[in-house]
Amino acid sequence: MQLDLHAPLSAAGLLSIIVSVGTIVSSLLTPKLLRLFGTGKLVFISVALTAVASVGYGFSATFWMMCLFAIPMGIGAGAIDVSLNNFAAIHLESKHTSWLHASWGIGACLGPALFALSAFLGFGWRGAYELVALLLGVIAVMMLASLPIWKRREHLDGPQQSPASAPDISLRAALRVPGMKLSFWTFFFYSSLEISTSLWCGTYLVARGFEPEVGALAVSLMFASVMVGRILSGFFAIRFTDMRLVHAGIAIVVVGCMVLVLPLPLWVTPVCICLLGLGCAPVYPSLIHATPARFGEELSGRAISIQMAGSYLGSIIMPPAFGFVAGHFSVIVWPVALAIFVGSLLFCVCLLDYVTRKKLNNAFAAERIMDVLQQVKAMEEQRKRARRERRRLRRKQKRQKLLKSRGR
């Protein structure tokens, strides 16, 4: 791919940044799009966008052409994430949300396999993207055929739970709700933990004395652990609450980080990486599913969009930040970085629970949140009136100055 496009190796980072920025912007705009299209139509449009972007990747003759198609890829990915997570959090049980997120692990394992198969058959990286586009096209057709089912399910639980009936809540107003900023930072540190684990665990093993093949295998084992952990956590979700699963997952990650720094036999290190994957598994889907109970269904779409933005921002910033630190010190400090991420995550989760219980009182969250939003709306209207009044006074002063100058 690099040789085909005559691009430097660092260009892959630029492509990733374009997709990630597009995903962040798209996730923040998704609540408005959900009111306009509904969940089913928006997911169909988003999948179709990613399919078009994959076709564009496969046929790109230059790197800058790939950058152009990275924009719809990011927009589609962000809208899919927010809309599906919001639908699952409101309409499905916790176990279904865990199993939905387990499919991410399947895709993470399947993607490299498709590229390897395409290379083996002689189609190269372009053939792999065309195959991905074909699969996404099939999913888009299935989504189009299932649109009536989406509408029926949304209205089955009550018209007030339909995205079209959700109130128009601005980003500024939502951030005034107690716990919303903490929710952003919770997902920021979770993604920092998960992405840093997947990106740097192989390099860490090689630095500890393992063969590069073992390091590559550890990355695959980490993704497999997340997938298996989410499948298993779906069954545990039948019996335990979302927050118990979150706390259990963080506890497993803490144990994994502690064992990493102990002077144990070398073979224990890959086992610890699997432990990190298992610990990460229930945290993300359980936090997502707890969102409507924490902030109310009216604010769920906006809250999840903020959480997704925090997640993507963490995945953009923290891995290269650790790379900078590792370049100045050593990759051996990787467990210390993980400890900082998991400590920050635990602090945010505990503080988020405290704030939402104290200030919102989960049983009355929806009513309290709507009161907060009404207060914010009143303050915004007051600021708008004040700005209009200031503009009117400035225009009046300009007219008076103009009249005085003419009088002279």
Predicted regions and their residues:
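Helix-loop-helix hairpin linking two adjacent transmembrane segments in secondary transporters
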Residues: 100-151
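Conserved MFS/SLC helix-loop-helix module at the cytosolic interface between two early adjacent transmembrane helices
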Residues: 25-64
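Cytoplasmic helix-loop-helix junction between adjacent transmembrane helices
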Residues: 69-104
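C-terminal transmembrane helical hairpin of 12-TM major facilitator-type secondary transporters
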Residues: 240-287
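Helix-to-loop junctions at the C-terminal end of transmembrane segments
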Residues: 26-38, 229-241, 326
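A late C-terminal transmembrane helix in Major Facilitator Superfamily
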Residues: 297-331
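Extracytoplasmic gate region of multi-pass secondary transporters
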Residues: 178-227, 231
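Helix-breaking motifs and short loop linkers at transmembrane-helix boundaries and internal kinks
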Residues: 6, 38, 59-64, 241, ...
